[in-house]
Amino acid sequence: MEKEHNLSKNQKIIFDIIDKSGGPMKAYSILFDVQKKGIKAPLQVYRALDKLVEIGKIHKIESRNAFIACQNSSCQISKATAFSICESCENVSEISNSKLSKYLSNFSDNSGMKYSKYNLEFFGLCKKC
């Protein structure tokens, strides 16, 4: 069950921009877009991004240092994310696969490493490329 979060004004503005972008956005691109809506300081953007990541509304694509809207509501409660990233067009797709989650959970149990979250990124070429 997805937990409902009350977003602040800044969080809502930033989430809407990321969600409508259709792909990953870097923090300074977000700042450029939100300045027209009254958010002027980078710190305001970073605080909102941190909170949106924390509650699972967006994800950070570590290899691109960019943010993307969550495409799968179940990861908002599991803290487990995986992405396929096209090396040519840079299209990013969120992977929601219960078998992958189960495998990583078993791996964690067998290795003795208890993870608090994971963010996997797989690279290759998409069907279009």
Task: Describe each model-derived feature in a short phrase.
Residues 1-16:
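Short alpha-helical segments that sit at the start of domains
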Residues 13-21, 33, 55:
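Short amphipathic alpha-helical elements of helix-turn-helix/winged-helix folds
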Residues 24-34:
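Short acidic, hydrophobic short linear motifs in intrinsically disordered regions
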Residues 36-40:
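Short, basic interhelical loop/turn and adjoining N-cap
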Residues 43:
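Key DNA-contact positions within bacterial/archaeal DNA-binding proteins
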Residues 46-50:
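Short, hydrophobic-biased segments on the C-terminal half of alpha helices
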Residues 53-61:
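A short, conserved structural fragment
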Residues 60, 64, 68-129:
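Non-DNA-binding regulatory cores of transcription-related proteins
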